[in-house]
Amino acid sequence: MEGANCSLKVNRHLLDPKFESYKLSLDPLPCYNVELDAAVAEVTLRDDQYTLDHMRAFGMYNYLHCNPWLPNSVFYIDQLKRVMSFTVTLDTAMGKPIEVFRFPRDLNACDNRLCSSMHFASAQWVTLSDGTGTLYIIRIGNQSDSLSGKWEIMFNQELGEPFIVVHSISSVRDELHVIDVLLLSVEKDESDIEGSGFHVCLEWVSAARAQNQENGEYEILKRRKLFGKSVPHYAAIEPLGNGVMMISYKPFRFIANEKDPHEPSEDEKMDEDNKREPLYNWQQTGEEVTLTFLLPEGKTKEDLNIKFLPGEIDISIKDQGTFLKGQLYSDVDCESSAWIMKEGRGVEVTLTKREPGCTWAELVIADKQGEYIADPAQTAAIAEKLMHLTSEDINPNPESEKPPCNAQELEECDIFLEDSTNLCRFDGTHLKATHVVNLGSNPYLFTFVATPELMPCFALRHDVDALLWQPVSEQPDNLWEHIATFNALGYVQASKQDKKFFTCAPNFSYSALCECVRRIFIYRQPTPVSTELYNRKEGRRVGQVAKQQVASLETTDPILGFQASNERLFVLTTKTLSVIKVNSTA
C-alpha cells in the first residue's frame, strides 16, 4: 500500500501504571422504559447474505442514532417508515418518541432492501438512506424544528444498489455548500472465485449547491469509490472534505473509472508487469554463473555482441540496442568467460567467478528483468544445513524446560484470524494513501463522537488499556492524538464473549458495553472516595476507586441500538427504548 508509514504517539501522561482493577458497585442505576408505538424497522440478513462482512455491516448494525449537537436526543426508524425522535427533558416524566420524518416511498417493495440508516452531518443537516438505494439530504433547521418534526427534503436521488450511510459532513468550499457522505455496500464479485464472492464498496458522494441560494437544488459533484475485501471498522471524511480515514483488516483502493470497477490500479499494473515472462534466466554453482536467453525472431549469431568486463556485462543486439547492461554482483574472470549459441535461438553465457564459493544474490545489480533458477543440489545442501533448526513434530521435546506456546492459554485478543489491520488516510484529490499505520497488536474496539465539529474518535487496545484517538486533519505530522485512556478496558472487553455494542461518554467519565440480550456493563473512571481506604496487603492508602456496575433490562428482546451521553445510556430493543441514568447532571 502506498503512503508514508506512521506510528501512533501515546501520551504517557494519560496512562495509569498503578491502576489495579474495577470494584463491583451495587449502587442502583435508575432505568426508565418507554414503549414504542411501532416496532423498530429491523431488517434481518437474507440467505444470500452469508459472509462475515454481511454480518459486520448489516447484522450488527446499530439502529439507534444520536445527534452529537443534542446529546440527550436519540433517533430510530420504525416499521411505519418514520424517523422517530426521543429527547429527555425530565427523568421522572419521560415523553414519547415523536415523528420527525417519513420516507415517501414503500420500502418493503424492494426485495434486496437493507436497513435504513442516517447520520448527522451538522446541527442542521442529516443524511438518510431508505435501504433501497436512495440517498436523502434533509435540512432540519433550528432545534425547535427538529423536535416538532418539520424536516425538509433538499435532495433525494437513487444511486444504484442498496447501501447504508457510514458518515457525512457539511462544509462550505469555493462558495458552495457541500454535503459529503460515505456509503457502504457489499456487492457480488463474479471475478472473486477463490474468496467469498463479494467485495466491499465504500462510495464517497459529494453533493452541492451555491452558498447564497438557500432553496437551491443540490447536485452531485463527484462520486468516488473505494474497493476492498473487508468491511472497515472505521471510516470518516475529514471536516473540510480533503480526505478519508479508515481502519480495515484488508487494504482499500480508489478506482478512477466508475464504469469499470475492476480496472486495476497502478500498483496492480506494476504487479502484472512483474508477472510477465522474464527477459533471461540465470543460475549458479560455486565456480560460475550461467545466463540463458532467446534471440528475437530473425536474429542470428552475427547480430549479437557481448562484452565482458571484470565487474560489468554488456549485451546488445543489432538494430535493437542494449539487451542487458550493468554492474555485476561480483567480479568475473573475463578470459575464462564465454558464450555459445544453443539449439534454436538460445544463447548461453558462462561467467567464471573470480571468487569461487561466493553466492550471488542477483546477476546485475538492481535489474529485475531476470529470473533466478535455483540448483536442486545447492537447495538440498542448504536444507540439510538447516535441518537441526526444523522439526516435523509440533512439540518434539515436551519435557523441555521451555515448552512451546500452548494455544489453549491464548485469549481471544491474542488471536489474529485475518490480515494485519491498517489505519489509513486517503487524499481526496489524488485518490492515494498518504499515511498508513499498521495497528498490529492494537485491535480496534469502538468508534465515538467526542467533539461534533471534529471527526469521530476511535478506541484501540494498547496492552490491557483502551486508548481513545482523535483524528486531527489539520496536523499532517500528527494526524491522530491520544486524548483519553480507559484503564484495563482492553483486557476486560476481551472476556465478554457476547458483547454487541461498545461506547463511552463524551466527557470520558465512563465506558459501557452491552451484550446481545439484557445486560449492560458500565466502567467508570477512577474517582476520589469520601473516606480514605487502606490496602492491608500492600500496606498503602487508596485515595480513589474505579467502579464497575451492571444493569439488566426487563425485556429479553435482542438489543438493537446503544448510545451514550454524559448522564445517560440509551438502549433500544424491538419495542422498547430504555434510559439508564448513569451520572447526575453537572
Swiss-Prot record:
It comes from the Eukaryota. GO terms for cellular component: cytoplasm; nucleus. Its main location: cytoplasm. InterPro entries: CS_dom, HSP20-like_chaperone, NUDCD1. CDD domains: p23_NUDCD1_like (cd06493). It is found in: Cytoplasm; Nucleus. It holds the Pfam family CS. Residues 275-364 form the CS domain. Keywords: Cytoplasm, Nucleus. Gene3D superfamilies: 2.60.40.790. This is NudC domain-containing protein 1. It comes from Xenopus laevis (African clawed frog). The lineage of its organism: Eukaryota, Metazoa, Chordata, Craniata, Vertebrata.
